[in-house]
């Protein structure tokens, strides 16, 4: 198995024995998107997108994986004007 670490709004974390692929399938796709082989982001928490990075706060970001970049870019273009 694999461990998945969930980062919560209050900066706490929960670690669970779960495959990221299964977590991705369980989460609502209109709210979460896989952006890297190691990361799923809450789309409502995106602050900005700069040079292959999704910022979820002013200083915290996750990288966009090459295999996920095109789908993420399509999402951004469809949902955000000023991001």
PLM segments and residue spans:
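Conserved binding/recognition cores within well-folded domains
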Residues: 1-57, 61-63
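Eukaryotic intrinsically disordered, low-complexity regulatory linkers and tails enriched in Ser/Thr/Pro
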Residues: 67-83
């Amino acid at each position: 198995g694999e461990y998945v670490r969930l980062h919560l709004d209050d900066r706490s974390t929960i670690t669970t024995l779960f495959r990221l692929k299964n977590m991705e399938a369980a989460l609502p796709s209109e709210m979460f998107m896989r952006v890297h082989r190691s990361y799923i982001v809450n789309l409502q928490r995106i602050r900005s997108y700069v040079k292959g990075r999704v910022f979820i706060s002013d200083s915290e970001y996750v990288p966009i994986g090459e295999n996920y970049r095109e789908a993420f870019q399509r999402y951004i273009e469809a949902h955000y004007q000023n991001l």
